[in-house]
């Protein structure tokens, strides 16, 4: 699901894959994108490059939230950063091997 008003134009294919995996990790809970290439983020945020999205967490309790977060982090692997923020889970495609970038493809 995508929150009303969220702009997903410009998301990279990697983020589409990440969202598909996130939906499986959320299981019985709704997996809602609350921010993508829209919104206000830090000046060097990967949101502006289409390489990050935020997922809603307000409907998850403590144990459920931790379970989803840990499963997502494990499932996405080391090419993605998964950060548990106070009101969302931030997911970004940030491969550590910088020899190949989106622009090179």
PLM segments and residue spans:
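Extended, low-complexity, intrinsically disordered C-terminal regulatory tails
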Residues: 8-44
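Catalytic cores and adjacent binding grooves of peptidoglycan-active enzymes
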Residues: 5-9, 32, 40-45, 49-53, ...
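N-terminal, Lys/Arg- and Ser/Thr-rich interaction peptides
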Residues: 1-3
